Amino acid sequence: APKQGLNPSHPVSRFGAGNLDTLKKPGLLDALKRFYTSEYSANRMALVVLGEEPLDALEQLVRDRFTEIPNRQLPSSATELPLFDTERLPFVVQSRPATEARWLTLLFPVPDTDAFADRDPLRYVGHLLGHESEGSLLAHLKSKGYANGLSAGESLSMTESRSFSISISLTPKGFAHRDEIISEIFRTIRLIETRGIDSWRFDELKMISDANFKFEEESI
């Protein structure tokens, strides 16, 4: 549903999933092959390899498995289209889920933050908004019986376009007080803007990030 609020001309706004009904349409396989031929090329791809083997062995491993990918010398697939059509904002989308669930999601267009990658400002703001300690936004909403959980952070990252989302799992009572919850969200955002950055919170986030990296489970 949030995709309905994006710029309809942007590729990300297109339907990105299928089911037995949509995937049974005739000609789909041929269309997929045409898309592969027109859009997939080695010069558009990047690969990161991590392993304990010597560098020469890793290089040979990659060559053995990926050299058959054709290089069609295609131009960059990046688009300069904005992710959001500002003339359509603010935009409200309501949908009925297939399961018993109540979610309130706020999606904000934000400037590109690549120049600040070493400081990761969106993660810092997401950490503040998503904190679960006493006095936090979630703790306040829980005390009123409005929410079960909250997450915040960067949700879409495209060339020159990004978005930041705040998603709250609502109780039935919270669903009936959506406008009040939205007001509380913006009150918290204004509080962050007014108080600025606390060094101890930045250090807290750094400590959490270091611990997550150190104890991250290996994946295959």
Language model features: what each stretch is:
Residues 1-77, 83-87, 92-121, 127, ...:
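Charge-rich, well-structured scaffold segments of protease-associated domains
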